[in-house]
Amino acid sequence: MSFMIIEEIKERALNLLSEKEEDFKVIDFSFALPYSYVLIESNGKKALGVAMTLLEEYRGHGNRKDLNINKNLEEFINMADSFDIVERTLGVAAINAVSQYYFNFEANGKDAAELVLNRDDIKKIAFVGNMIPVVNMLKKSEKFDIYVFERSPSLLMDGVLSDAFEYRLLPEMDAVFISGTTLLNDTLDFVLDRAKNAKLKILVGPTAQSLPELFKGFGITHIASTKIIDVDKALLYLKFASSSMLFKGASKKYTMEVE
């Protein structure tokens, strides 16, 4: 039986908890806009994990939702492969929180676009998800043929293709920037399979802020995400739905190879 990537990542995260034997407590969590989050603490050290909230996937729960607010960290992580988008989002955020807790490197501030800007063997680039800042940066270079795919109606605009065309076009790409939200809508496996000819397959965004070792063996070459450096400030920004300030004032971006 083959496992989906998110199922394997979940198991790796649970194994990490077992190995470290840390006494984690879930301090706070929220399914919120634009990012959901899980806040954990152990031995006086706090860590915050986030995941983008895919509002278009949310269908509501009425009165049937199990409102158990006393879940432990393992229970949160076990929700990462749930078919319920609220549970799944919080599960991925919990995995990211554990990853942020164990990150032992300095964020290098490197932008994902730098991976392709100086390469002569990259011509066709796909974006699975409309990552407007990175797309614009690469368009300015006028070196590449750029294809942007998007599922969310709010990000479909001129020049952006429906994600229905990924199946046809991804095999032709030299590099693919993949939104971390593919972990949430279960499309990461499909994207990596269709993009297997690409020299670079880069998982991008705050939702991808997990430890690189959790992604080994899947075909991802790099992760470009954010390390939260001021948990309290980031939490305040999240409560006020301020994504731009979250990235400018409380975290630092990084790009890392998945070895």
Swiss-Prot record:
<dbReference type="Pfam" id="PF13938">
    <property type="entry name" value="DUF4213"/>
</dbReference>
<dbReference type="Pfam" id="PF04016">
    <property type="entry name" value="DUF364"/>
</dbReference>
<dbReference type="InterPro" id="IPR007161">
    <property type="entry name" value="DUF364"/>
</dbReference>
<protein>
    <recommendedName>
        <fullName>Uncharacterized protein MJ0500</fullName>
    </recommendedName>
</protein>
<dbReference type="InterPro" id="IPR025251">
    <property type="entry name" value="DUF4213"/>
</dbReference>
